Amino acid sequence: ILHLNPLQEAVQPEGDVNWRGLVDKIADVCARLGKPVIVKEVGWGISAQTARRLIEAGVSAIDVAGAGGTSWSQVEMHRAPTERLRRLAGAFADWGIPTAESLVTAGYVRAELNRPDVHLFASGGIRTGQDVAKCAALGADLVGLASPFLKAAMESAEAVVEEMELLTAEARIAMFCSGAEDIEALRRPGVLVEEK
């Protein structure tokens, strides 16, 4: 998994902002590794242009990790050693492309390039089983979330299991109320997402 964190790098004192030739390097890793390569954003979403470049570079999957989850610019704001860096990082607290928008955009690019073999993952601001169902309806092959589990883990291992069961029940209810018997049915136009 290769993670992309340009904003975080730009607002931290030790950040590396020399990203020249990055797509070529990713393409080289994809060609030489012999294993699936996943590229993950870290909370600001993947644009159409970035999705296109990554798919053309040969990645196997993209985690769009859109805005709405952990804001690494805010993390950097809290650890910044100077007021200037705190202000700089804080200025980008709301930066990014929301997960749903990024997921739909990456899906259009994947379809345009005729690359159904490239998997799309959704993370960033996912909190409920209903969110999971919506991401699946928008084309996510995998949905990731942390916040509900981290909060439950502060309580107990049993609370984590309960959270997992609750999220599963919420997703199933969303599917039931949508008339979708499985994930593929949930993805049909008109079920959760309007036909275009």
Model-found features: residue ranges?
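Active-site beta->alpha loop and helix N-cap motifs at the rims of alpha/beta catalytic domains
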Residues: 1-13
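Residues that line or immediately flank small-molecule/substrate-binding pockets and catalytic motifs
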Residues: 2-4, 66, 147, 190
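Short, well-ordered helical secondary-structure segments
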Residues: 9, 49, 84, 88, ...
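Generic anion/oxyanion-binding catalytic loop in active/binding sites
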Residues: 11, 124, 175
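Glycine-rich phosphate/ribose-binding loops and adjacent secondary-structure elements
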Residues: 19-157
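C-terminal extensions of enzymes
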Residues: 149-196
